[in-house]
Every structure is written in C-alpha cells, then in structure tokens.
C-alpha cells in the first residue's frame, strides 16, 4: 500500500486495557498506517501514570511525532497526568458516554475494572465461561466423544483448518461450549459421519479451506510430507465437502477469515446467543 506511515500507539487503562485495545485497533484499521503498539494495563495511580507519561514523552522526543494514545481511566488525577503528555490522547469510553448521558438523562458511575474485572455481579457469568473453556479443552480434536449433548456446537473439518482456535475463541470470548472433531487421512478411504455424532447433527458445523492454503499451513508443521502435499490436501478437502453436502451440514470456507470472523459467522448461522464477558 502506498504512502503508509509508521506511528507509535499506546493503549492505556486502569484495568486490563482490553477495551482500549479493541476499540483502538478498530479505529486504527481505518487508516493506511503501520503501527507499533504498546499496551499498558493497570495504570491505577499517579506514580504509574507519571512513568507512562515519561514513556510517551520519550518517544515524542526521539521521533518528533506525537504518539497516539487511546486510554480508559476512571480517576481524574491519573487521567490528567496522561493528558499532560506529548501524545495525541483519546478517551475511547468518554466519547461514547457523553452522548449516552444526555440521551439517558443519567450520570455515569464509572468504576475501575468494571468491564473485565471479577465482581459479585458477574461471578456466575465468569464461572460459566470457565466451565465452557474446560469443556472445550476436554473435547478438542475428538479427544472425548462423551457428553456431546452438552455441546452448543460441534465443529468438523480436516486437520489444520482452524477448528481448535475457533473453538477456544468461542469458549473464551462468548462462553460457548464448543467441541470439535477432525477428519484425518485414514478416514478418507471410506469417509462417513461417525456414529457418535449422528444424534447431534443439528449441532454440527463444518469448516473447509482452500487446498493451497491448507498445504502451506501443513508444510510448516511437516515439511515435504504426504500430509502437506497438494494432492493430499485437495483430496481431503473434496471428500469432506462432499460429506457436508451429503448430510446437509452447514459449513464455511475459513481461508480468508480471521478466527474472530469465523466464530462470529458460526454464532450467526447457528443462532447461538452472544454472551459478552
């Protein structure tokens, strides 16, 4: 891309900085900018804030270009120190809170760590998410075929098409109990839907991938192997897609999608509730 510029970006918060990172990344993705990012969570006191200010100012002195600072900080005295820095500072939460305050006719009651912190109000949700993660890990890659009735979705696909990272993302981000089952090379001579999965066909969701991309991924894992050959990858993808069509299993091609996009498409297509934590 022409005219791409480099900028230093800070994501700063008195909590985990997850919100600052997510919103900051979303904003920066709109511009042809190559960024070097620094995330600084738990900036909760003036001493820590002054150290952060010095870090921002040092980069400005070195480069002559103002760092971009996306922050979410509750305490005014801590926030003020960051604002005194040589960075271009944007309060990512306040930009949304102010118009909502007017619309709701309510004053906000900001509390540090509220978004991603653990407190009595969200303890049950937290426990449910941990249970989903435990379930997903126990049912990764066909390790266990027990308790599939408890799964909310069962992902299918050839080896290295994205089943495991997608399952874990669904569990960690949305509290979804996601099992996944691999179709391996030995299955291809007589590929069929395993008997253990047939009672749960309504929960099945398939992933496929372009053979060229699959071969490149597998080559990194097992160089110059039959497993990574184009012939093998083409055959496996064709067989698995035929299986999906035969059993009317919904599926998507994961080649050009991130894990986040794959997970979101699965939630939408399967009609699963998004539970944010």
UniProtKB/Swiss-Prot annotation:
Which residues are in coiled coils?
none
Positions annotated to bind ADP: 157-164
Keywords on record: Kinase, Nucleotide-binding, Serine/threonine-protein kinase, Transferase
Chemical reaction(s) catalysed? [pyruvate, water dikinase] + ADP = [pyruvate, water dikinase]-phosphate + AMP + H(+); [pyruvate, water dikinase]-phosphate + phosphate + H(+) = [pyruvate, water dikinase] + diphosphate
Which residues constitute the signal peptide according to the record? none
Concerning Pfam families, the annotation shows: Kinase-PPPase (PF03618)
Q: Name one GO molecular function term.
A: phosphotransferase activity, phosphate group as acceptor
Give the protein name, as stated in the record: Putative phosphoenolpyruvate synthase regulatory protein
**Whose protein is this, by species?**
Cronobacter sakazakii (strain ATCC BAA-894) (Enterobacter sakazakii)
- Top-level taxonomy: Bacteria, Pseudomonadati, Pseudomonadota, Gammaproteobacteria, Enterobacterales
């Amino acid at each position: 891309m022409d005219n791409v510029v480099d900028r230093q970006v800070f994501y700063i918060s008195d909590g985990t900085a997850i919100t600052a990172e997510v919103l900051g990344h979303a904003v920066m993705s709109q511009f042809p900018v190559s960024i070097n990012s620094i995330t600084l969570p738990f900036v909760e006191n003036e001493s820590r804030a002054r150290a952060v200010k010095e870090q921002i100012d040092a980069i400005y002195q070195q480069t002559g270009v103002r760092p971009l600072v996306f922050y979410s900080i509750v305490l005014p005295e801590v926030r003020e120190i960051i604002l005194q820095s040589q960075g271009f500072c944007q309060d990512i939460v306040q930009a949304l809170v102010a118009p909502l305050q007017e619309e709701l006719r309510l004053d906000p009651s900001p509390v540090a760590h509220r978004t991603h912190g653990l407190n009595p109000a969200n303890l049950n949700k937290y426990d449910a998410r941990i249970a989903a993660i435990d379930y997903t890990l126990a049912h990764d890659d066909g390790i266990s075929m027990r308790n599939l009735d408890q799964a909310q979705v069962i992902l299918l696909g050839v080896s290295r098409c994205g089943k495991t990272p997608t399952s874990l993302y669904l569990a960690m981000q949305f509290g979804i109990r996601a099992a996944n089952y691999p179709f391996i090379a030995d299955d291809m001579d007589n590929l069929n839907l395993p008997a253990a999965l047939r009672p749960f066909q309504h929960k099945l969701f398939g992933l496929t991938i372009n053979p060229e991309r699959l071969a490149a991924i597998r080559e990194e894992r097992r160089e110059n192997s039959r497993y990574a050959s184009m012939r093998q990858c083409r055959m496996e993808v064709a067989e698995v897609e035929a299986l999906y069509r035969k059993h009317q299993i919904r599926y998507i091609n994961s080649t050009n999608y991130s894990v986040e996009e794959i997970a979101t498409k699965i939630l939408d297509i399967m009609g699963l509730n998004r539970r944010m934590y």
